[in-house]
């Protein structure tokens, strides 16, 4: 019998309440996971409401089969394609709210066979959809040291990126790295200084995972897609878990909340004057988890929830 892994949804009520759900509205849960947000959204919907859930993890899609509700449907695919899914259903401009819970889920981290965690030994995979793309082991085997170092520095902000990258390449010449424990031990040995209360492999594992799954590109495409499909006054609710994710979300909301920028002191054309009111989003707010939530679920500690509202054209 397959082992089940518990997932505690972070900022559950806050993220869903921020959608300002209408009973007959149409909503998207772009990261189904184990369905915590989806089930709560469904509880707020009336008989005419609809919820479209998306996840690229086959295990998450399988978990969605437990929801027997005519108002609910699940798509196996990346949330970066949400605009395409909406267009296929003729719902562009009719979506009343979109929720995105970014990053890796607890079941993915806790299942050693998925290869996301340095705390549990398993195959070095890290793909959110194991049926697509190359695994972390395959990439590390074929990548140059400079490329590995760039990934570790860019996506993990790892100060010892070059040392770790050289160690990985040298190890792979002797014996292929295929297990998470072996990689974690190699990284620990390559780091001359350790951060207090943080495993030395934390940043590198995050960086490799982000790269393997193109996570930051996926977020940018999903946000642009959300802007295309939201109805006037539709809400966007996004939970991020580290600074790289939150930076993208914050920048996107700020960019579309300001409207076109014209250098000060320059005369404006009639077209530019008209465009000055051309903002497409309104920043609604930002929330952090409460102390009690962090106490019950330490993984919530770094989470940030941001809201935005689609403005009428």
From Swiss-Prot:
Protein name according to UniProt: Ribosomal RNA small subunit methyltransferase H
Family: Belongs to the methyltransferase superfamily. RsmH family.
Catalytic activity: cytidine(1402) in 16S rRNA + S-adenosyl-L-methionine = N(4)-methylcytidine(1402) in 16S rRNA + S-adenosyl-L-homocysteine + H(+)
Binding-site residues for S-adenosyl-L-methionine, renumbered to this chain: 35-37, 55, 79, 101, 108
Record HAMAP family: 16SrRNA_methyltr_H
The UniProt record lists the keyword Glycoprotein: no
Keywords attached to this entry: Cytoplasm, Methyltransferase, rRNA processing, S-adenosyl-L-methionine, Transferase
GO terms (BP aspect): rRNA base methylation
Organism, scientific name: Musicola paradisiaca (strain Ech703) (Dickeya paradisiaca)
PANTHER family, alphabetized: 12S RRNA N4-METHYLCYTIDINE METHYLTRANSFERASE, S-ADENOSYL-METHYLTRANSFERASE MRAW
GO molecular function: rRNA (cytosine-N4-)-methyltransferase activity
SUPFAM superfamilies found in the cross-reference section: Putative methyltransferase TM0872, insert domain (SSF81799), S-adenosyl-L-methionine-dependent methyltransferases (SSF53335)
Gene Ontology cellular component list: cytoplasm
Biological function: Specifically methylates the N4 position of cytidine in position 1402 (C1402) of 16S rRNA.
Enzyme Commission code(s) on record: 2.1.1.199
Cellular localisation: Cytoplasm
Keyword Cytoplasm: yes
Cysteine disulfide links: none
Predominant place of localization: cytoplasm
